[in-house]
Amino acid sequence: MKKYANDRGIRIIGDIPIYVAFDSADAWMNPELFAFDEDMNPIEVAGCPPDGFTADGQLWGNPIYDWEYHKKQNYAWWIRRIRHCEVLYDVVRIDHFRGFDEYYTIPYGMTNARIGEWKKGPGIALFHEVKK
């Protein structure tokens, strides 16, 4: 499809969401990439803290990455993910880019995002690996 579009002067922009779903193939095939307990339940999940728009914050529920594991693997999963998207799209946009700098975690099982904490993400190190 990309070649067909490109041959007609059309460029395709595609999105990569920063997080995958708990019940995704990525999470179940690669549990070591995520902060899961021994029963494969998330230890914490993604979201946003309360703000002027919502007193409860945003509880997205996606599992949180084990960034230390990703770092030890030189971010190989992320590199494969981005490279695959480069085949499909001319421009790749990563949704919630800020989450690579800092991300908000909520203990698994909470019904809102009032209780949570900001943690440091991989930062520019991940993108240096992607660029290699």
Feature roles, as predicted:
Residues 20-132:
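Alpha-amylase-like alpha-glycosidases and glucanotransferases acting on alpha-linked glucans and related
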